[in-house]
Amino acid sequence: MDDIVNVYNYHNDLSQVLVYADSVIAGLENKGRQGTAANYRSARRAFEMFLDGSPFSFEELTPEVLDRFVTFLRERGNRPNTVSFYLRQWRAIYNRACADHVVFSDQKPFRRLNLKEEVTSKRAISREKIAQIECVDLTACHADMQLARDLFLFSFYTRGMSFVDMCYLNKENLQGNYLRYKRQKTGQELQIRIEKDLRVLIDRYASPLSDYLLPMLRNGDRYQDYRRRQRRLNKLIRELGDRLQLDMPLTFYVARHKWEYHKNSTINI
């Protein structure tokens, strides 16, 4: 009987990091914020593996523990940006716990960690490779291959717009010669001037039957449908990179990091 009570108490003790993370994830899912919930769930899973079944409270979360967590992740082959991703999710969860008065400590365990994502030259492909992607003839390929290529270019032309933000663009975001939208992840408002190449893509996918600018979502789509399409388009953009014999895997992140890497160049983009 005592064991049952202890298990019940554990699963209702929000001072336990995994229990609190579960409550945050459930709340996000109820609000329809499936992407953030998925990110937190991934970070939670990694930390649960690190704990190896041991209970762990927020009071025990110190810089030294986080250092061990980083070592644990690296020893399992996680790349620096993956490690940084997990730490950023846990910092966000920790900050929520502070705001909810679950954590009362002022030790700031994340203060000395470098949580910035690296922009690597490996991802920042040359402008000549971008031109190859722009000019490749895909008329004999499935229409989804052209869509994957066009989404890659759309991201590049819009200064690295994320996949999820492209998905949710609608006609109200078109305001004259500008594209104005809020980032799904942060709510930050952005404005992008619509130049010729971007206008071509917008016009190509314009449809009176959809409120969206690009054909990834339909009205009423579930998050799972969005993720399934994202996986397919990710697969196709990698296949396009192989087709062009690029010296690196082609992903939508490449378009985003290409912009970051070259944003101070003199190339007219």
Region roles according to the model:
Residues 140-143, 234-269:
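Short, basic (Lys/Arg/His-rich) helix/loop patches that form interaction surfaces
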Residues 110-163:
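Basic, Lys/Arg- and aromatic-enriched nucleic-acid-binding interface segment
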Residues 130, 195-247:
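Active-site/catalytic core of tyrosine-dependent DNA strand-transfer enzymes
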Residues 73, 154-155, 169, 262-266:
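Short alpha-helical segment immediately N-terminal to, or the first helix within
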Residues 22-35, 44-121, 136-139:
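N-terminal core-binding DNA-recognition domain of tyrosine recombinases/integrases
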Residues 95-104, 155-176:
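Short, charged phosphate-coordinating catalytic segments
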Residues 168-204:
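Conserved tyrosine-mediated DNA breakage-rejoining catalytic core shared by Y-recombinases
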Residues 1-45:
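N-terminal DNA-binding module of tyrosine recombinases/phage integrases
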